[in-house]
């Protein structure tokens, strides 16, 4: 019996030793290359919270490392589980990686998330999850439907959504009072705008009963939530990538894939049958691509790429911006004055005007900075290159090594943005956003050739909603909402965002 117990203990010890050796095999990787390794370094890597604490955002673990080393080094060696990764502490180096040396860092870590399940085809059809020449082709196809000239022709879609938004607020005020949960309101607006722009349909999110959530909005909410949780789940499997194949892990669920396939097929058939003929929107672009040889599945992949940016991230920025303005009455009044002055001449704001209202732009950029919907950007070294570590030291990087650009940390660094936690739109006056981006300090959409392709759509959605709300209502904060982790990807308002909408006297 004692022999059996001893044998079992030996097996346990050996198994533990094997696991420990497997997890820590690379932990001298950065030391051997003359790069400081972030401490503490556990068997779970530099960011153990990603594996052991569901309620702790990866952003917080990165923040701890950033705070400890940012004043000492341009970059520091870290590990996501056992995967070696550089954390870029110097924004100037971030600009170099994202822009100047883009050809050496062309691919993203998300491109390694696909291909493990052949049925997960729509995520594989997104440039966000693609690499190499495939990324270049998919991005080119996608961007063609999002050019400024095309959005200008489609601007009436956003204007109509803005009018529906005001009508919905009025119905909500009559039925439930002036206090409206604004997170829900924001996503109702972005659901309506994206359904109309991408598929040419009325989602019913603003025209249905107050508080009722239709199939499109519900499916979009479930789909985007699953997409962000998949990001974290796939990051966790960096410790053992074979797990993805073993369990045929999917990024999007089968149910949502089927929903958006049916929706896209029906939309294409309706348009080709004469409904909405001559309309300039994203659906017309998808049909043009199909006429050149794209399949319906290619169209679904492109549609979902735009939808993720236009629905989820735009909605998040919108309710955060309204929350900030509700707390800062002076800034809200200044922005309202600018909007009303622009409205005075024509009765509505044109596409060109909405993109040339300086204070609206400042408030939008400050909201992007505070929210930072994409907290970090990960790039893969695709060609051998050398980076300057400072103090006459350089580092030779090999293909396959990943780097993290921590946009959230730059945006909330008091050395870059004094009183960084405060809402101060004046930070972005006189074209400061462009200057800060070139310094690598302002990266809400990333930078370089892989900059977020839904950037213009998101900007148009948020600005249009703000114009329609502030030209009709005074928005007041009813209670403080704490910040908290959300899907591990960022730090967002955690709880109901209840704001009071008081009709302006005209």
Curated annotation (Swiss-Prot):
Its EC number is 1.14.-.-. It comes from the Eukaryota. Keywords: Endoplasmic reticulum, Heme, Iron, Membrane, Metal-binding, Microsome, Monooxygenase, Oxidoreductase, Phosphoprotein. Heme binds at residue 452. Belongs to the cytochrome P450 family. PANTHER family: CYTOCHROME P450, CYTOCHROME P450 28A5-RELATED. This is Probable cytochrome P450 309a1. It comes from Drosophila melanogaster (Fruit fly). The gene is Cyp309a1.
